[in-house]
Amino acid sequence: LFERSFKIDFVKIIYTGEKLNLMNKLLTLTLGCLLLIPQLVPAAEVNILSERQEFLLRPFLKAFEENTGIKANVVYLKKGSLERLKQQPGAVDALLTVDISNLTAIAEAGLFQPVNSSVINKNVPSNYRDPKGLWSALTARGRVIYYSKDRVKLSELSTYEALADAKFAKRICTRSGYHKYNVALISSMIAEHGVAAAKNWLQGLKNNLARKPQGNDRGQVKAIYQGQCDVAIGNTYYMGKMLERDDQREWAASVGIFFPNQNDRGTHMNVSGGAVTRDAVNKNEAVRLLEFLSGDLAQYMYAQVNHEYPVKEGVSYSGIVSSFGSSQEGVKKGIFKQDKRNLSEIGSYRKKAIQILDEVNYDK
């Protein structure tokens, strides 16, 4: 008889050919047990490039990590995300940024990949998403008219177009026309009226300026407070932030918000948004991030913390934002008519907007 010795864990088994079947069973059982032992695998993660400020984004990412178990690694930039994505393909899975012009420019450069998520499609209205799924808005802000409560009657205000009327001569302040928020507004005028009409409007707006374009949106509120001008153009959420600051509350309290174009297309909206990069290594995790940021919890946090408008319907505005436009007919609890034109179309006119800014020498 064929006979050998085989040792497993100090137990010596003497077996013959008849016992070979038993040995096969033991090996099978051993392999099965090994498969039950947890394997050491890298933790899920997502690498993020953000042009949103760290203090604002940090609580959202903490909530994301706690809810999903995905680690969020972030690099913060003030600007230059297009160049960074070109220089370091594959280093970033998701981009978080502000302004439709930024999102459109990077999409046109081929640095995003399409995402087809039923969660995002449900949470975010179609006008706030790229038609090809290349990016999605996460919050919105209105580009509104700031006005002096003491020197301007509501009956004087109506539309963006009317800001070029002679009655506003030497009464308007703006920041640089080349700032992304103004470029987006001018792009929306081109989308609505065409290049020639938008240029005429921009020339009329320039003619009505009380001073050379300067400062930021908060600076326009301060200028109204100081009497340098009566009317300005700015984003809604800045007013919310100013009302929370002791050193700026008095400025903001003297200025009202008017939502233009309520009787036609609605107020121009801009956004913060997100996208999955073309070379994302952790694509699934990047999609999970955008889904989370478009969901109820993150949308509520955006609204309450930064006084932005949630893009998901049914999420409450902050108390401050709900008070905006309270004196304006047709505006109730801060709810107003928004321009529903797809933002990708508006963003596509950004180069023409810059061209007519050059042609009218807006900042000079």
Enumerate the language-model features and the residues they cover.
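Periplasmic-binding protein-like
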Residues: 122, 127, 141, 202-206, ...
